[in-house]
Amino acid sequence: MILASLARYYSRLAAENDEMGNPKVPPYGFSEEKIGWILVLDKEGRLKTAVPNLTADKKPQPKLMSVPRPEKRTSGIKPNFLWDKTAYALGVEANKNKAEAKENPFTSSEKTFDAFKQYHLDLLQNSDDEGLQALCRFLKNWQPAHFATENLPAEMLDANIAFSLEKPTALIHKREAAQSLWAGCLKSDEALEGCA
């Protein structure tokens, strides 16, 4: 009885919007996460620009964004769907060695990038959505060393990033095909866990 009441309450909140026009709670399978940067890709998967997604405060902070819920990472490598921190999405993280950091601000994290890349290529390869295909092309061509050659800002290191298509401007994880694919992933996860 309590669970049914909580489910009804959640449904009511999900149907209501806050003062910014966003749902009061994220839809099932989504979570509000701090996303600091948005990488804008063209249809060919080329990186066009990196747009900061930060608050206008004195000390800017990443803004909250509704994204597919994050994986639980107690141990092992588990990429998130269509967003992640730079170690996964770009294969680079901040250099922890302070003495070297001035000259080499980032280090390569190829294992996490390879997992992110393979996870997405496996999931997205059969989609005909231009946003999902742009991300596939980006991941096929991206190398962690490109972080320096693309002149991406060091402030981006270790931040969560999401992807957007250049024209029409749209966050890739909010595209209809991405939402359908994510819903299918959630159903298969529930079936594996015996929740279906």
Where do the PLM segments sit?
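Conserved phosphate-interacting/catalytic interface
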Residues: 1-196
